[in-house]
Regions:
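P-loop/Walker A NTP-binding module and the surrounding RecA-like catalytic core of P-loop NTPases
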Residues: 74, 107-111, 117, 121-329
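Non-catalytic terminal/linker segments enriched in charged/polar, low-complexity residues
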Residues: 1-125, 132-133
Length: 329
């Protein structure tokens, strides 16, 4: 654990601070996203971009690339339409290749969307721990997305940073889920609070928080039951866990391979529960990550973490520049 003297003193509220869905402070990332296309722009002379078959062909090729990267049709169409409207009438140097100008503008537009509301996971946790320990992280999502494994990865990441972490096995609908999280906890050397199958999920989560507070642990990660977003009774049970625990952060876990299904899930979870950021899993597969852009577009919430493998260390802060390179090769 971080001793009190080692914890950062809470700084005055910064201009790059935001609030979570439960009113806690999120620290925006200082990653720079802007892509400079000024080398092609000019105030006089040059060439004015006009609509027509050449521009249409370039934009169609780029839209096909976005769609093949698992980006949803609605998000890609809106992005391309906005780009077309922005480009027409712009003045560029006569020697500027139009396809290069358009591609750079598209990358800038994508980065602009991804940086909207983007916050730094590690900095936010450190800031929250310094002022309101134990910090409670609630993990939500449907079955099969990698939620339990991601919970364990986050526990490992924070344990490596010196925090005492408690895992809460609040997925009480499946005995296998309880055993799985407990096994992760044993391997990681962290505590796991659990009950028998069929227990009260909210009670397990509450017990974990009270135990952490009593023992001076700094972070509680609640692994909730996988909920299909169209099952009202299950979503209501999840809302109960949220009401009882009042988490500092809610992380929605999405499967990069799920494509438009992941987007629909995110929309419904955002409507019923409201999450602060998403963790996109299974990016070690042949998924190119377009679902990340669609989720951000549809919910207004950022991707903050990505899973890149099955190992505990295969969890990284989301880098929007990396995604742009995946989408537009």
């Amino acid at each position: 654990a971080l001793r009190a003297a080692e914890r950062p003193i809470q700084p005055p509220r910064e201009s790059n601070a935001m609030d979570s869905t439960t009113g806690r402070r999120l620290i925006q990332s200082d990653v720079k996203f802007e892509i400079d296309i000024s080398e092609h722009e000019t105030n006089k002379g040059g060439m004015v971009i006009s609509g027509g078959p050449v521009l249409d062909s370039i934009l169609e090729d780029l839209e096909d690339e976005l769609l093949s990267s698992d980006m949803g049709h609605e998000a890609s169409s809106e992005l391309i339409d906005s780009l077309r409207a922005h480009l027409i009438g712009s003045r560029v140097g006569r020697g500027a290749p139009l396809d290069e100008v358009v591609e750079r503008a598209l990358k800038g537009a994508i980065l602009s969307l991804l940086r909207s509301g983007y916050w730094d996971f590690d900095k936010t946790i450190r800031d929250l721990v310094s002022s309101d320990s134990p910090v409670v992280i609630m993990m939500v999502g449907v079955n099969g997305t990698g939620k339990t494994t991601t919970s364990a990865k986050i526990a490992k990441r924070l344990d490596d940073q010196g925090f005492d972490v408690v895992l809460a096995a609040a997925d009480t609908f499946r005995a296998g889920a309880i055993d799985q999280l407990a096994a992760h906890a044993d391997r990681l050397g962290v505590r796991c609070i659990k009950s028998q199958r069929g227990g009260d999920s909210a009670a397990v989560a509450r017990d974990a928080i009270e135990s952490a507070r009593a023992k001076g642990d700094e972070v509680v990660i609640i692994d909730t039951s996988g909920r299909m977003q169209n099952k009202a009774n299950l979503m209501e049970e999840l809302q109960k866990v949220h009401r009882v625990t009042k988490p500092h952060l809610v992380i929605f876990v999405a499967d990069a391979l799920a494509g438009n299904d992941a987007v629909n899930q995110a929309i419904e979870f955002q409507r019923r529960l409201s999450f602060d950021g998403a963790a996109l899993c299974k990016l070690d597969t042949d998924a190119r990550g377009g679902a990340a852009l669609s989720i951000s577009h549809a919910t207004g919430r950022p991707i903050v973490l990505i899973g890149t493998g099955q190992g505990y260390d295969d969890l990284e802060p989301f880098n929007p520049n990396w995604l742009v390179d995946q989408l537009i090769s």
